[in-house]
Each structure stands twice: as structure tokens, then as C-alpha cells.
Curated annotation (Swiss-Prot):
Sample GO molecular function, one term: UDP-N-acetyl-D-glucosamine:N-acetylmuramoyl-L-alanyl-D-glutamyl-meso-2,6-diaminopimelyl-D-alanyl-D-alanine-diphosphoundecaprenol 4-beta-N-acetylglucosaminlytransferase activity
Membrane topology note: Peripheral membrane protein
PANTHER family named among the record's database cross-references: GLYCOSYLTRANSFERASE, UDP-N-ACETYLGLUCOSAMINE--N-ACETYLMURAMYL-(PENTAPEPTIDE) PYROPHOSPHORYL-UNDECAPRENOL N-ACETYLGLUCOSAMINE TRANSFERASE 1
Keyword NAD attributed: no
The protein's name: UDP-N-acetylglucosamine--N-acetylmuramyl-(pentapeptide) pyrophosphoryl-undecaprenol N-acetylglucosamine transferase
Name of the top EC class for this enzyme: transferase
Organism listed in the record: Helicobacter pylori (strain HPAG1)
Function: Cell wall formation. Catalyzes the transfer of a GlcNAc subunit on undecaprenyl-pyrophosphoryl-MurNAc-pentapeptide (lipid intermediate I) to form undecaprenyl-pyrophosphoryl-MurNAc-(pentapeptide)GlcNAc (lipid intermediate II).
Protein family per UniProt: Belongs to the glycosyltransferase 28 family. MurG subfamily.
Known EC number: 2.4.1.227
Keyword Glycosyltransferase: yes
SUPFAM superfamilies linked: UDP-Glycosyltransferase/glycogen phosphorylase
UniProt gene name: murG
Length: 353
């Protein structure tokens, strides 16, 4: 038995691949990885000991490109698919798991050509174009969101790494706010943090701001101009995000699926600012169910004003009829919404098929 993991491009897809690879390693199952030279795949897995072999193809996405660029991208995908076909045959792969993203294309199609069972994990509430096409052909499609289109869909807990559960806690007071710009940085969140920082620090609320490497120098300059650089924690990125989340009582974040469920596992109440240009507006739909259940706050980017933060803080500090703060109730309910060992459940479901 030997698995191939494929897909990525961005941290959200790749974090799922990593969680699944860790689980395969725990069960003593060998795995290889097939991704792209474009995006973050090599950065994550080029030297990863989780895989016995790693392959990166010269491929790019097809969505949001001009007609001629789409043709070029499709040609690269097809060329890579035939290479992947030989690689899967060489390694005698018995199962392929796609975590989505454009870099999953070659190995997914190669698996179908080689008649290798293909399993898909769809991280978002709205499927990407590749997964929409492949779902009816896959052995199973795992997701934390309910889908009604064609395909064998299996509802599972999101494969969040156990550290997010281990560092979870119930929040009782807002003393520390985390502004999470993500690995790519988020201009809207960075500006929102800077606009609110003077009032927050004046009220004695601590700030941790992860602004992204491309924005670090500019954001640092503005904090310095505000005279706040020595009063806040500013990082381009952070290697121990679980520890950072653990210290925070409220978060401001984009709504990529991995971030949403990691914050959920940590029990950290969050104001989500969905990236408005995400394909099919999927970031908004990632948190729609949470919003309907009053488990988060959603602020559209085009309606984002500094006062929104303090409106949310006031609401979180309000108490219900039993005298419990909304902050505490939400924090508790978030921890109950997601179960541990999502990756283990997915792998065991595949092995028992």
C-alpha cells in the first residue's frame, strides 16, 4: 500500500496535505507528493521527511486568465499529467488524495487514467473548478461543509493539527487582540489594525499583529510614526501560530477555510473579513454557517470601519440571561463545533473502503 498526496498552491490546501501526511506516517504508510513549482508547494514540501519522494511540475492555474493564457496553462497541465501517470505507475501507488488547488490537476487526472482510486478533500464551502469536475469521478469527497452536487460526499471534521486543540482555552475577558494578516499579508487587516491601535493600547489591550513579509517594513514604519512600536507585537510571520492564538482573546482574520477551523478548534472568537476577490466569494461562504449560529462576526471589506471593532467588543462583553458573557459562550461553542483527529478519520475511512 502506497499513497500519493497532491495539490496545494496556498497554505490552506498545503496544511491539509501536511495533516494527512502526518497521519499516514503515524500509521506506517509510505507516501509521495506531487505538486507545482508555482505557488508554495516547494516551500512546504521540497525537503519534507513526510514523503519518500517529491515531484514538482511546471504548472499554473487556469481560472481568471485570458483565453490564450488558459490554453497555455491547460497544455502545461496535460503535459504534467502524462509525467504524473508514469510516476504513479513507477511507485505502484494504490491510493491518491487530492487536497485541491491547481497543482492537484496532473496527479488527479493521472490517477483516473491509471485506475487508481482518487479521494478528494474540499476545504471550502464552495468547490473550486477542478474539484467540481473531479467530484463525480472520485471514490469519495471529504469536506466539513455539506454538498448536494454529484459525487460521494463524506462529512468529516476538518483536518486541523492537534496543536490547535491542545492550545485551546475558553475566553473570559478581552485583554489581547490578534490581527492575522496571513502568509500573503492582507492590506485591509493591516490598515484596520493601525487605525484601531491607538485606542486599543490606550485602553490597555495588548496587540499582536502578523502582517505578512511583504508588508512588514511599511507596517512597522506606521507603528513607529504612531509611537506604538514598543507597545505592540509585530511579526512578518510566526512559526508558532498555536501559541500566538492561545494568548489572544479576540482575532481579526481573513476567512480561508484552514484559518476558520483552526480558530474554531482554538476557541478563539473572531471578526472575519472575507477576501472579496476569492473565487466564487468562497471565503464569505466559509463562515456563513458560523455567522448564522452567532459564532463569529463578519465584516465585508468594503464596509470596514474602525468603529466595527469596538462594536464587536461591546457585544462580546454583554451578558446573557444566566450572566455569562457572549465572549465566553462563543468560545465554548466554537470548541464543541469541531472534533479532534479529522485527518485520522479521513485516512481510516479510506483504508476501510
Amino acid at each position: 500500500m502506497k499513497f500519493a498526496l497532491t495539490g496545494g498552491g496556498t497554505g490552506g490546501h498545503l496544511s491539509i496535505a501536511k495533516a494527512l501526511a502526518i497521519e499516514l506516517e503515524k500509521q506506517g504508510i509510505e507516501a509521495i507528493y506531487l505538486g507545482s513549482t508555482y505557488g508554495q508547494d516547494k516551500e512546504w514540501f521540497e525537503n519534507s521527511p513526510l514523503f519518500s519522494e517529491r515531484y514538482f511540475f511546471n504548472t499554473q492555474g487556469v481560472v481568471n486568465k485570458s483565453f490564450f493564457k488558459k490554453i497555455g496553462s491547460l497544455f502545461l497541465q496535460a503535459k504534467a499529467a502524462f509525467k504524473a501517470k508514469e510516476i504513479l505507475k513507477k511507485h505502484q501507488i494504490t491510493h491518491t488524495i487530492s487536497v485541491g488547488g491547481f497543482s492537484a490537476g496532473p496527479a488527479s487526472f493521472a490517477s483516473l487514467l491509471n485506475k487508481i482510486p482518487l479521494y478528494i478533500h474540499e476545504q471550502n464551502a464552495i468547490k473550486g473548478s477542478l474539484n467540481r469536475y473531479l467530484s463525480p469521478k472520485a471514490k469519495a469527497v471529504f469536506s466539513s461543509y455539506a454538498f448536494k452536487d454529484k459525487g460521494h460526499h463524506v462529512l468529516t471534521s476538518y483536518p486541523v493539527q492537534n496543536a490547535f486543540f491542545d492550545f485551546a482555552r475558553t475566553r473570559t475577558e478581552i485583554k489581547h487582540i490578534l490581527f492575522l494578516g496571513g502568509s500573503q499579508g492582507a492590506k485591509a487587516i493591516n490598515e484596520f489594525a493601525l487605525l484601531n491601535a491607538p485606542k486599543l493600547t490606550k485602553q490597555g489591550i495588548k496587540i499582536t499583529h502578523i502582517c505578512g513579509p511583504n508588508s512588514y517594513e511599511q507596517v512597522r514604519f506606521f507603528y513607529q510614526e504612531l509611537g506604538l512600536l514598543d507597545k505592540i507585537e509585530l511579526f512578518a510571520f510566526h512559526n508558532n501560530i498555536t501559541e500566538v492564538m492561545h494568548r489572544a482573546d479576540l482575532c481579526v482574520s481573513r476567512a480561508g477555510a484552514s484559518s476558520v477551523w483552526e480558530l474554531c478548534a482554538n476557541g478563539l472568537p473572531t471578526i472575519f473579513i472575507p477576501y472579496p476577490f476569492a473565487s466564487n466569494n468562497h471565503q464569505y461562504y466559509n463562515v456563513l454557517e458560523f455567522e448564522k449560529e452567532n459564532l463569529c462576526y463578519v465584516a465585508p471589506q468594503n464596509e470596514l470601519l474602525p468603529k466595527k471593532l469596538f462594536e464587536v467588543i461591546r457585544k462580546l462583553n454583554q451578558k446573557d440571561d444566566q450572566g455569562n458573557k457572549n465572549l465566553t459562550a462563543i468560545s465554548n461553542q466554537l470548541q464543541q463545533k469541531i472534533a479532534k483527529d479529522g485527518a485520522k478519520t479521513i485516512i481510516e475511512t479510506i483504508l476501510s473502503a
